[in-house]
Structures are given as C-alpha cells and as structure tokens.
Amino acid sequence: MTNFQIYPAVDLKDGNCVRLVHGKEKNMTIYEDDPIKQIQFFLNNGFKWVHIVDLNAAFGKSNNKKVILKILKSFKDKIKIQLGGGIRSVEDIRYWIDSGVSRIVLGTFAFNNPDLINNLSDYFSKKLALGLDLSLIHI
C-alpha cells in the first residue's frame, strides 16, 4: 500500500475561508468566516498539514498577511502550514519561511524564473513546492 497525505485547503479571501468555482472571484462561496476555527476543525480530525492559499495576494489585491500570521501563531508546533498565492519574490519566500510556514508553493513566479528557482531549491531545501493550475490545455 502506498502512503500518502491529504492536505485540506483553506482559500483565504478578505479573511474568509472561501471556495472559487473555476478560479473566478465572481463564483465565490464563503464557507467559514473564521479561518482559525476551520483549521482547528482540521487539526481535531487528525490532519498534520493545511494548505493555505492567499487569494487576495494571488489576484494582486492586497493580502491576508495579518490573518496568516495569526494562524501561524495559533497553530505553532500543532499543524504544518503550506502556503501559496501571490508569492512573487525571494523576499516573500524568506519572509514566510522565517514566519513559520513549513512549505511555500510557487506558481507563476517559478515559471517566470526557472534559473532562480533552481538556486532557491538548494538554499531552501524541502521548503518549496511547485503548484500547477491547469485549465484545459493552459498552465
């Protein structure tokens, strides 16, 4: 049997836990207004990791930095956080790792800077992952 881990996702938009349909903001449903409560639910149900996406940052419209920092403080040493969305610089990567994020998921930044990513992978070791969003035949 192959071992695998499920990472429940928390997509943050304006501090709320949301779900987008086909990645469109206009097709958004808020399913929890307290991300701490949502992550506590995942922790109570045995999950070891949570995947958080900052949709505000991903869409280039502010960010959920304060909310994410509160999550990191609330769950330090309890659950690992994997973070993606709007991370577009080495400074962003360093900031979030230094703040306690266990793994950074890079998307567009990685594709636009492949040589830099090769160097970063040496520096940050197992702290980076590559995220691909596919739509029909487009990445």
Write out the residue ranges for each language-model feature:
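Conserved, mostly hydrophobic/aromatic
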Residues: 11, 42, 50, 96, ...
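Catalytic cores of alpha/beta
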Residues: 81-100
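Alpha-helix-loop-beta-strand connector modules within alpha/beta enzyme cores
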Residues: 61-82, 119-132
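Glycine-rich beta-strand-to-loop/alpha-helix junction loops that act as flexible
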Residues: 53-55, 82-87, 106-108
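Glycine-rich, proline-tolerant flexible connector loops at the mouths of alpha/beta enzymes
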Residues: 49-67
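Conserved small/polar residues in nucleotide/adenosyl-binding loops
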Residues: 137-139
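Structural preference for beta-strand elements that scaffold enzyme active sites
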Residues: 5-9, 49, 78-82, 103-105, ...
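Glycine-rich phosphate-binding active-site loops on the catalytic face of alpha/beta enzymes
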Residues: 99-116
